[in-house]
Amino acid sequence: MASKKARKPNRAEKKLTRSCFKKQVPQHNNINTNTIYSVPSPSPAAVLTSPGGCCTPKAKKSRIPEMLTCPPAPKKQRVSKNCVLRRRQIVFFAPPEIELFFVNAHDR
């Protein structure tokens, strides 16, 4: 029987935690990080009015009205009459030309 050290690691054992993927920022002893990355705080009035910046309006007048019935199915478009009238018949041969061909061929 194989020893416990030789077996493959379980999937649960292999799974990495989320903290493994975070980029580690090097810390320097002589630099205060609070002064480098400090951002001026907004005024208290701005914090109360817009906690997360932009937001979706939730008032009833801003909502899209619900449809009570389904819309009708799309209908097939009709072919315009102009398109049908423009179509010419295909002429394969003209009868007078055929008669002349046979007359000339018979004379030779």
UniProtKB/Swiss-Prot annotation:
BP term (GO), one: regulation of DNA endoreduplication
Nucleotide-binding recorded as keyword: no
Xref: InterPro entries: SMR
Highest taxon, organism lineage: Eukaryota
Sample GO molecular function, one term: protein kinase inhibitor activity
Keyword tags: Cell cycle, Protein kinase inhibitor
Cell cycle in keyword set: yes
Physiological role: Probable cyclin-dependent protein kinase (CDK) inhibitor that functions as a repressor of mitosis in the endoreduplication cell cycle.
Record's protein name: Cyclin-dependent protein kinase inhibitor SMR13
Species of provenance: Arabidopsis thaliana (Mouse-ear cress)
High-level lineage: Eukaryota, Viridiplantae, Streptophyta, Embryophyta, Tracheophyta
Gene: SMR13
